[in-house]
A protein has these predicted regions:
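Charged, amphipathic alpha-helical regulatory modules used
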Residues: 1-110, 717-722
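Non-cofactor substrate-recognition interfaces
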Residues: 13-15, 421, 696
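Conformational switch/transducer regions in large eukaryotic molecular machines and scaffolds
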Residues: 14, 677, 699-702
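Amphipathic, well-packed alpha-helical segments that form the structural scaffold of globular domains
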Residues: 23, 458, 462, 513-517
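Conserved catalytic cores of very large enzyme subunits
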Residues: 89-501, 522, 526-688, 694
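Contiguous, well-ordered alpha-helical segments that form the cores/surfaces of helical PPI scaffolds
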Residues: 299, 505-518, 538, 698
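Long insertion/accessory domains within large nucleic-acid-processing enzymes
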Residues: 684-723
Length: 723
């Protein structure tokens, strides 16, 4: 059994430390109030049993809470008072040096919490450590100086989650849709260097990767680009190559048809070379965030402005999917699944039915998904129904990064819809499980507590908004001055972009399943519990609309992915309420509105059921189905894609893509338990060295490849197949 020290280091559990601490507290009181050696040993044993029952590494603070409770249970009030006083004095000492120990432990690679925090960061690398060091300082400043103490306390206790406090000290926003079209067509500036409109497709792609890196270094959330914005440069290259071929063939007896063949062959070669940087540079770039950019590439034929551009876009999409299917090579030279870029493919009327002109692209996408877990899929049909602007027109567009969707918006200056160049200000998430447990199952109390917690989230969201107010465009020129998000003047404040629907701000939620299960005794898939689940969703939407109307800001409801926070929430719930069977007996809580990962339900029923809840998450959400190896059953994959097209706006298929560098095993790397800790192990050779294992799993929208904390690992282990 392990214990997590205050600096984040994970060490073996030592019962003698409990015995020593209680003995010192007991010796501080006189006479009959002192405990016998047997009583002290019993207390230590009881605490040890409680820790083992949690089936995870516990923190020092949790152990001390358990000791206090044991002392109070046996009426040892004087000893408990001395124990609590000692804790308080030590706490005051620590407050004089709030970050030193944590920073030193992460530099020495001893901080287990940091090691497991982000599935796409390697905390042993210097550049990542620098980001984490800055993050520790930011979190400390946020907690001590920048945030309302009530919000800080609620965050620490797991009532809410104030996202990305490791970046809150700076004036940074969350995620966005990069206006690559504006930057490529009208030029941009990168690091003080003017970049003019590119004269070839490959150059456009190279510039795009530089833009991606610059944008990622100036925000903390994901970004999305569209391949449509690169499509015009295919014809630029075609004409350039055609002129070169004409010059080469001048005076030779070469037919026009033969010349066209040569042009198309060279053009295809350039498209291949152009797409490669988007794949390879993105996964090898290191931004100031200490990781590869969280980039999503959008593939939507319906965005093309004319027939030629659509045909050229199809070529780019085909090449992008082919390269992703191939993968990237690991250190051993073996092709593996990369985490980025995330790919989103739009299912539409001319690519979803056999015989459609672009059906071959959907078949290729299905083949790639079966092997590499991407692309994910948006249904144009369903999105046009759900994303309707004030003029009654439906729109299809990509999410910002993983799942955060903008609200429909009509530019008041042009009267046209606008999506690229818009962004999200930030997220605060409510823990629905805590609301339910705090109510004790009383519905009247539930709604009262729910409103109190939502009001707290609202205040926290206002703090995020106020942190951006007054930000000069000079803070991030690539974003605010040179086209990624706007073309503001130097020194101009970004304030006008924070109101009127141009940007969004998100109320996140997590644990709907556990919330409903506790209040009704049933899963929200049960007909008797579903109405309550929908009423919870509607209530949060009503609050967002109320705040939006009062403040002229686009509050929207967001299905929080909870990559590492799922573990934090679970630990906080266990601390506050103990082990409640079926509710807090796991080291994770369920993402957003999802069906519980262990619930047996088929893929089609799951997608249909969750589509009703996705509709009520306008600020972002994604559904998934867990599938076995489908590489030899692409017909089944295509049937799922057809179902997605007809029934749900945004969904993905999860499979497994692993490799053991020690023995060459390329099947599923298993999760096994060792002394109360979940570890990854090759079932063929027993290798547990994470540096010699390539494991790719869907974390929560993105693919993770750097392993996960104990809560998320348990959630991955508990997943059942839906197909």
């Amino acid at each position: 059994m392990k214990i997590i020290k205050r600096n984040g280091a994970e060490v073996p559990f030592d019962i003698t430390k409990i015995i020593t601490a209680v003995t010192k507290a007991s010796d501080s009181v006189g006479g009959k109030a002192r405990l016998s050696r047997e009583q002290i040993t019993d207390i230590a044993a009881a605490v040890t049993d409680q820790c083992q029952a949690l089936n995870r590494a516990v923190s020092v603070e949790e152990v001390q809470d358990m000791v206090e409770n044991q002392l109070m249970d046996i009426k040892a009030h004087d000893i408990a008072r001395h124990y609590i006083t000692y804790r308080y004095i030590q706490s005051l000492k620590r407050q004089t040096n709030t970050t030193d120990e944590r920073i030193l432990s992460l530099i020495e690679c001893q901080n287990e919490e940091v090691k497991q925090e982000n599935a796409n960061k390697n905390p042993t690398v210097n550049s990542v450590q620098r980001d984490y060091m800055a993050g520790e300082i930011s979190k400390d400043l946020t907690a001590r100086l920048l945030l309302d103490p009530e919000i800080v306390k609620a965050h620490q206790e797991g009532l809410i989650h104030f996202h990305d406090s490791d970046y809150f000290a700076q004036h940074m926003h969350n995620c966005d849709l990069v206006n690559l079209d504006d930057m490529l067509q009208n030029g941009t500036v990168i690091s003080g260097t003017y970049i003019e409109k590119p004269h070839s497709f490959s150059t456009a792609c190279n510039i795009a990767t530089q833009i991606i890196a610059q944008v990622a270094s100036n925000q903390y959330g994901g970004q999305s680009i569209s391949l449509t914005h690169l499509a015009p440069f295919v014809d630029v290259s075609r004409k350039k190559i055609a002129a070169e071929v004409e010059a080469e063939m001048e005076g030779l007896d070469v037919s026009d048809e033969r010349k066209r063949e040569i042009v198309e062959r060279r053009l295809r070669s350039e498209i291949n070379r152009g797409v490669q940087p988007i794949q390879y540079q993105v996964v090898t770039l290191m931004t100031t965030n200490g990781q590869a950019p969280f980039i999503t590439v959008f593939m939507y034929l319906g965005e093309a402005r004319n027939a030629q551009e659509k045909a050229d876009l199809a070529i780019i999409i085909e090449e992008t999917i082919r390269q992703r299917y191939q993968g990237v090579k690991n250190e051993a030279g073996v092709w593996i699944t990369p985490a980025f870029p995330k790919l989103i493919y739009v299912l539409e009327e001319d690519n979803i039915h056999p015989g459609d002109p672009y059906y071959y692209l959907t078949e290729l996408a299905a083949k790639c998904t079966a092997k590499r877990m991407v692309p994910d899929y948006i249904s144009e049909k369903k999105m046009l129904e759900l994303k309707v602007d004030k003029n009654g027109e439906g729109h299809c567009y990509t999410c910002m990064g993983c799942r955060s969707f903008l609200t429909p918006y009509v530019d008041p200056e042009t009267g046209k819809p606008k999506y690229y160049g818009r962004f999200n200000q930030g997220v605060v998430t409510i823990n629905l499980v805590d609301v339910a447990l705090s109510s004790g199952g009383n519905f009247d109390k539930f709604w009262k507590i729910f409103d109190e917690r939502l009001a707290l989230c609202h205040r926290a969201l206002q703090a995020r908004h106020k942190r951006l107010l007054g930000t000069p465009s000079d803070a991030a020129p690539i974003l605010w001055q040179y086209g990624a998000l706007a073309r503001l003047k130097k020194g101009e404040k970004i304030d006008k972009l924070l109101f009127g629907g141009y940007s969004t701000i998100s109320l996140g939620y997590a644990g709907l399943y556990e919330c409903v299960k506790y209040m009704t005794g049933k899963s929200h898939t049960d007909a008797g519990a579903k109405p309550f689940a929908l009423s919870v969703m509607q209530h949060m939407n009503d609050k967002c609309n109320e705040w939006k109307k009062a403040e002229n800001m686009d509050y929207s409801l967001y299905g929080t992915p909870l990559e590492s926070t799922t573990y934090k929430f679970a630990k906080c719930l266990q601390k506050r309420f103990g082990i409640v069977p079926g509710i807090t007996d796991k080291n994770y809580i369920t993402n957003s509105y999802h069906v519980h990962v262990s619930e047996h339900i088929d893929a089609f029923t799951k997608l249909k059921f969750e589509s009703e809840f996705q509709k009520l998450s306008p600020g972002g959400a994604i559904s998934y189905v867990e599938v076995p190896n489908m590489q030899d059953n692409l017909e089944a994959v295509m049937s799922v894609l057809q179902f997605i097209y007809d029934n749900i706006m945004y969904a993905e298929l999860n499979t497994k893509s692993d490799y053991c560098q020690c023995c060459g095993y390329d099947g599923e790397i298993k999760i096994v338990e060792d002394d109360g800790k979940l570890v990854w192990e090759c079932p063929k050779c027993g290798n547990r060295d994470q540096n010699k294992l390539n494991v790719a799993r869907r974390t929560c929208g993105y693919i993770g490849t750097q392993f996960w904390n104990q809560g998320r690992t348990q959630e991955i282990k508990d997943r059942v197949l839906h197909l």
